[in-house]
Amino acid sequence: RGYSNLDRFGCLDSDGDGWSDVDPGGLDGVEPWFAHPNGSADAFPFTPSQWNDTDEDGFGDNWADGSWNETRMNWSIGVWYANASQPDACPFVTGFSVEDRFGCPDADNDGWSDPDSNWTASNGADAFPDNPTQWSDRDNDGWGDNQSEGALQVDDFPDNPTQWLDTDGDGWGDNNSYGATQVDDFPLIPSQYRDTDGDGYGDDINGFEGDVCPLSTVEEVESGWIS
């Protein structure tokens, strides 16, 4: 007993979407009935909002985003369906991304799709498509936002595009190039980060070799009268 009425009539339709379940063994006594795209049966027998899967990656051709309507209708695959489950953003290309969009190529298998001409890192694609431990770079400096244990190419300053490494872990960055901010004058000494008078001794009196006179003038420092 069944109630399918779209691909064939009167066959089992577990999710009630009108598309019959697969019957590869010909148990109906007629002939094998394969799932789309190899046949017309429901590729998602337990998901009523999906039934076709053109690229066979496990993500359906139907979509829920109305902005896709014109393009998808021109492609003649799938239909708009309110709250469609896991709509394939790349219906002609096999892919397994699940984070920023469903069903697109994901070279490093971290869940975030590889960027392409229509979907870049600024849209949500993987900013590091070959590094499975990184995917986002909100300050666009080439170092990743993920700071979890084991992550590579970690940005110690994810919101400062002029800094990325903090070797001594004091919250001040190693990069001292022109224009950089939050610069550590002592990148290897965690108890010092600023040297206001440029004499090589840190301003923090309680830190390593703290400067007793942190505001000495250039002339005083250069003359050696005071440090």
Which role fits each region the language model picked out?
Residues 1-227:
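Extracellular calcium-associated, cysteine-rich motifs in secreted modular proteins
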